Regions:
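Long amphipathic N-terminal alpha/beta scaffold segment
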Residues: 1-50
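Active-site-proximal loop/helix of nucleotide/amide-processing enzymes and allied scaffolds
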Residues: 15-20, 42, 52-133
Length: 133
């Protein structure tokens, strides 16, 4: 489900930009939500797509759902974003595995995954900054 954001069209050039756009909506949720930020060639946010809404601390993510809107929008790239309801943005082993799978799918589709940002309470983890992509 695509969501219209007031931030659409805003440049998203750093993990801090991602956090600024998504934290107000995600950091205090009681369940995990997984979003895809669809970017244009100038790294502007074209669309925010809510891929899944989980229960408590898990969220199932399938590449087909992640890339559906990106393909339709002719995305230049995407950024993966989800929250950890615990407030701790440390990536889990499942987070790492899903990210590897989605990066591989993005390569096949020629839609690069620029980052995966996990939102916690008042902080975040960027896979790109941490060297995990």
């Amino acid at each position: 489900m695509a969501v219209e954001l007031r931030d659409e069209g805003a440049p998203v050039r750093s993990p801090a930009d991602v956090h600024a756009v998504f934290a107000p909506r995600l950091e205090d949720l009681p369940v995990e939500e997984f979003h895809v930020a669809v970017l244009d060639a100038q790294h502007r946010l074209e669309r925010d797509v809510t891929v899944t809404r989980g229960i408590l601390n898990s969220s199932l993510v399938h590449p087909r759902e992640v890339f559906r809107e990106a393909i339709a929008e002719r995305a230049a790239a995407i950024i993966l974003v989800h929250n950890h309801p615990s407030g701790d943005p440390t990536p889990s082993s499942d987070d790492r595995l899903v990210t590897e799978q989605l990066v591989a799918a993005g390569r096949l589709l020629d839609i690069p995954v620029h980052d995966h940002v996990i939102i916690g309470r008042g902080r975040y983890t960027s896979f790109a900054q941490a060297g995990l992509l």
